[in-house]
Amino acid sequence: MRLREARTNYAVYRFDHQFAGVLCLQNADEFDAGTQAILHRCLWTEEVQPHIAESTFHEYAAENGIEKCRVELEPGDLYFFNTRCIHEVPPVQGNNPRIVLAVFIGYSSDDDEIFVWS
């Protein structure tokens, strides 16, 4: 959290790391799992941030051979990922709303507590 968050006035700021869990409850198209997320094999750094801010990350990824994977879930599937990985949530394609439940876990190696929020 501390790596890329400028706001310091909330409880989770004190943690160095965060991961997320996403539970798929309903897909946008009942006949197709659909892509819930795209995870890039690239951790956020200050070097990457301008490409995200300027919407040029896809070009940066292609030039640097950064792989990606599509997360396709069925209702009831749960996945966890390091939120420092560059990730995208594609627009909903289908007639139904996409419904997920997300939980976030913050932690640091120098802190005995973890923080969970949703």
Where on the chain are the PLM-derived regions?
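Catalytic core of non-heme Fe(II) oxygenases with the double-stranded beta-helix
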Residues: 1-69
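Catalytic core of Fe(II)/2-oxoglutarate
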Residues: 50-118
